[in-house]
């Protein structure tokens, strides 16, 4: 789909308009000039009188389509923020034209970002009441009432689960990345390396990780900075041996400040084929209070197609084993839109989930991530169309509501099927604090281990900077000391006395 757009000279419009085009068309390219082979031609004009700007768009078709939007530009804002307001006004017109042309309604409006609930949190922190905040978001971004209400439900749940969410900037959370898995799934782009035959690499990696944990723990103790949550992800953290897990958790309790006061420790035991009684005993020994066991689907043919070499029965058996051994906060992940699946298969998966009733359930919508096996071979992995994916999401919403689950976090991804979202549900009181913190970007998260990203949130301005460890084990093993020291330098500046929040 080739889209010609005339009337806009600023190249900063290109990316947001391309992202909106992607909501409607699987393969689309936009051009800021007239082209001969355009499938869609749109002319946009801007007229600004003092603070008011009028954006008009005309889409050339058999019957030309026209849309108009007026907006007020706050001239006291920075040039960057003024452009943002102008960009939103242009996006309104562009979206209206494409919706009228295709007959498709985008429930998230012009929003293409990952964290829509963050916008609602911002308005509430600025003093808006919930009803006003919802109306403003709907107007500013063309969000449907249905999605605005979902955002409000999630924000309410988050603030009930973490009442001090807005004042956690003086603490940190820790993400620990363990980059090994039994096999790599077809949809995955996380740092994940088949563990078989890599014991030498595993040993070197674990040596580097222990170093990072010691050094970072020492610095946090010296500065008197508390840890809110710890999350072991990957990869599959339970791919390593029970003895190796035991040594890691001992390191956490020895090196991290006030480890017994950490509010939540999560371990992704996502692949059932990595779970053993010995590993569950280790988790129990160290009071690990939240784990994930992820079926993704209860259709065996699907698991085989996506490269998960475990059986459905193994998922059920390992879940029951974890329950018998005292694990009382288990999350499970399901994915909507996996190859070969439709509403029938997803209904079956929900029915099987009902037999287990985990404390939380994360419902993902399949996303075609650029580097995944599935994206590189789309012809091989046939997936449901937009309409069927929406029906599956509706099934998930209905099922979770009927079974007492509440939505508590939400995020979106680029190239996600049906322009939908990923939603975390839980029983009230069983929400993952880490998931809330990372999605709403309320505090610094320090990434340790291979492929782990750190997200540094400035305690006063809220400005976010990123820092990533190498994704491949060899690069990590060769340079972990350097990356540890670099993170500590950033933290030294971030948590200097000059940067302390005045309100805390």
Positions of the model-derived regions?
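Canonical Radical SAM [4Fe-4S] cluster-binding loop centered on the CxxxCxxC motif
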Residues: 171-206
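Short, conserved phosphate-binding/catalytic loop or strand-edge motifs used
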Residues: 112-118, 155-157, 191
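Radical SAM enzyme core and accessory elements
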Residues: 1-132, 163, 424, 428-504
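Conserved non-cysteine loop/helix-boundary elements of the Radical SAM core domain that shape
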Residues: 192-395
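N-terminal [4Fe-4S]-dependent radical SAM core
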Residues: 102-105, 125-126, 130-174, 223
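A C-terminal junction/extension of Radical SAM enzymes
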Residues: 30-34, 38, 371-448
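Short, glycine-/Ser/Thr-/acidic-enriched flexible segments
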Residues: 237, 415, 451-454
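Beta-strand scaffold of nucleotide-dependent catalytic cores
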Residues: 177, 292, 361-365, 436, ...
């Amino acid at each position: 789909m080739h889209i010609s757009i005339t009337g806009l000279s600023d190249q900063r419009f290109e990316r947001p308009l391309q992202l909106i085009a992607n909501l409607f068309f699987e393969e689309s390219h936009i051009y800021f000039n007239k082209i001969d082979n355009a499938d869609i031609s749109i002319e946009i004009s801007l007229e600004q009188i003092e603070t008011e700007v009028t954006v008009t768009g005309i889409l050339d078709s058999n019957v030309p389509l026209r849309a108009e939007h007026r907006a007020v530009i706050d001239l006291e804002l920075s040039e960057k923020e003024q452009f943002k307001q102008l960009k939103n006004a242009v996006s309104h017109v562009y979206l209206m034209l494409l919706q009228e042309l295709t007959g498709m309604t985008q429930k998230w409006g012009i929003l293409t970002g990952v964290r829509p609930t963050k916008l609602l949190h911002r308005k509430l922190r600025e003093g808006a009441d919930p009803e006003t905040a919802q109306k403003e978001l709907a107007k500013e971004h063309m969000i449907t009432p249905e999605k605005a209400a979902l955002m409000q439900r999630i924000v309410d749940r988050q603030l009930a689960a973490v009442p001090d969410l807005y004042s956690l900037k003086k603490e940190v959370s820790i993400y620990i990345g363990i980059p090994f898995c039994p096999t790599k799934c077809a949809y995955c782009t996380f740092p994940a390396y088949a563990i078989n035959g890599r014991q030498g690499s595993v040993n070197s990696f674990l040596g580097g990780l222990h170093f990072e944990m010691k050094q970072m723990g020492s610095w946090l103790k010296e500065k008197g900075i508390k840890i809110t949550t710890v999350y072991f992800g990957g990869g599959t953290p339970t791919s390593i041996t029970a003895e190796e897990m035991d040594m890691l958790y001992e390191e956490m309790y020895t090196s991290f400040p006030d480890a017994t006061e950490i509010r939540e420790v999560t371990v992704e035991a996502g692949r059932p084929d990595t779970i053993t009684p010995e590993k569950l005993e280790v988790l129990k020994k160290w009071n690990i209070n939240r784990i994930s066991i992820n079926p993704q689907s209860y259709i065996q043919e699907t698991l085989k197609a996506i490269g998960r070499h475990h059986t459905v029965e193994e998922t059920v058996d390992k879940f029951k084993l974890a329950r018998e051994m005292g694990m009382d906060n288990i999350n499970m992940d399901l994915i909507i839109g996996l190859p070969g699946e439709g509403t029938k298969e997803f209904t079956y998966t929900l029915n099987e989930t009902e037999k287990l009733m985990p404390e939380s359930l994360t419902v993902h919508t399949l996303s075609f991530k650029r580097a995944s096996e599935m994206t590189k071979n789309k012809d091989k992995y046939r997936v449901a169309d937009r309409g069927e994916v929406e029906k599956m999401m509706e099934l998930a919403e209905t099922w979770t509501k009927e079974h007492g689950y509440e939505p508590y976090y939400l995020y979106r991804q680029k190239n996600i099927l049906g322009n939908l979202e990923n939603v975390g549900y839980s029983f009230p009181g069983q929400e993952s604090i880490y998931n809330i913190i990372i999605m709403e970007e309320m505090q610094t998260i320090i990434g340790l281990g291979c492929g782990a990203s750190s997200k540094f949130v400035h305690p006063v301005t809220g400005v976010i900077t990123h820092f990533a460890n190498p994704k491949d084990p060899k690069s990590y093993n060769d340079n972990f000391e350097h990356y540890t020291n670099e993170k500590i330098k950033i933290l030294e500046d971030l948590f200097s006395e000059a940067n302390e929040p005045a309100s805390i």
